[in-house]
């Protein structure tokens, strides 16, 4: 054990990027920050925390709730408040998802609200360097999704953002200002999503066939992989060019060209299956032990 720390949370949420980790209690007013040396700070937000996002550069963004207003605050890992964005819920909607860039200078947020009795959803980009200083509320781009609810946004890498809607996924490129790369529109409701630095994965259930259909796209929005499975996989991951799927006992690993690299049934069950940096090394965890395995 390199270090350990204790803290009190009721409903746990966390965000990790590089060597930085942030942990918060949803509805509480504390954010705990960590790096590889241990706990850095217990940040008192004064308002209830709804979401957090941490960057490799050492910044934490948090959505805070205050009656009819919500705030998106940025803190250093030591707890200094760097900026505040104030959003009126009845005008802007609720910030349902946020993600901060690796350098901490850009933030994307998905908002959902009601306007004239109809659902409205949007994705907004903020810039906190010199470019953003010249823009109103530091907004450098916004995209309207109408009644399509965007439930999650994330930075895949330093310059690529993905926004996941119910039946549409958008890829954006951002240096200082965002540009739409491609809208991926599908004729089904997306059940699960997963991602890596260079790929995104979509899963939906074919109820007629009682099978899951898994599709993987690159950051240009081109489909590069598709599989149908009746294994009822519960977990999906992408690491480099490896696509990992597993359930309580069964695990399969594909390469992005569709070839099976590994397929096995673990009789002791699977709690987690974690890819390591080396292409053929993994951490296998079950309820009784943890084991590092190397594929031939």
Region roles according to the model:
Residues 92-209, 213-214:
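Acidic, serine/threonine- and glycine-rich low-complexity intrinsically disordered segments
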Residues 3-110:
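Non-cytosolic head/periplasmic domains of membrane-anchored proteins
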Residues 7-19, 47-58, 90-100, 140-156, ...:
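Repeated scaffold domains used in trafficking and secretory/extracellular systems
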Residues 23, 62-63, 108-110, 163, ...:
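Residue position within the beta-strands of beta-propeller blades
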Residues 29-32, 68-74, 115-127, 166-173, ...:
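Structural motif
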Residues 1-6, 37-44, 81-88, 134-144, ...:
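A short beta-strand motif characteristic of beta-propeller blades
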Residues 35-38, 75-80, 128-131, 174-177, ...:
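Short loop/turn segments that connect beta-strands within beta-propeller blades
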């Amino acid at each position: 054990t390199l270090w350990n720390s204790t803290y009190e949370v009721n409903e746990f949420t966390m965000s990790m990027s590089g060597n930085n980790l942030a942990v918060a209690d949803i509805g509480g007013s504390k954010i705990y920050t960590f790096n590889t040396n241990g706990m850095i700070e217990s940040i008192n937000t004064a308002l209830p925390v709804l979401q957090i996002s941490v960057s490799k550069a050492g910044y934490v963004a948090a959505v805070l709730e205050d009656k009819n207003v919500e705030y998106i605050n940025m803190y250093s890992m030591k707890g200094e408040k760097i900026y505040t964005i104030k959003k009126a819920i009845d005008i802007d909607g609720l910030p349902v998802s946020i993600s901060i860039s690796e350098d901490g200078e850009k933030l994307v947020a998905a908002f959902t609200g009601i306007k004239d009795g109809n659902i409205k959803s949007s994705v907004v980009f903020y810039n906190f360097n010199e470019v953003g200083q010249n823009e109103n509320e530091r907004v450098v781009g916004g995209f309207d999704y109408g009644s399509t609810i965007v439930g999650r946004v994330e930075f895949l890498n330093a310059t690529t953002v993905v926004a996941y809607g119910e039946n549409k996924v958008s890829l954006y490129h951002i240096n200082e200002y965002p540009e739409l790369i491609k809208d991926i529109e599908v004729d089904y409701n997306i059940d699960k999503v997963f991602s890596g630095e260079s790929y995104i994965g979509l899963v939906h259930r074919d109820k007629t066939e009682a099978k899951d259909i898994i599709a993987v796209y690159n950051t240009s929005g081109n489909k590069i992989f598709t599989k149908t499975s009746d294994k009822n996989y519960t977990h999906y991951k992408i690491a480099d060019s490896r696509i990992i799927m597993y359930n309580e006992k069964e695990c399969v690993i594909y390469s992005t060209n569709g070839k099976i690299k590994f397929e096995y049934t673990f009789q002791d069950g699977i709690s987690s299956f974690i890819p390591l940096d080396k292409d053929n090394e993994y951490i296998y965890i079950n309820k009784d032990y943890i084991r590092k395995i190397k594929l031939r």
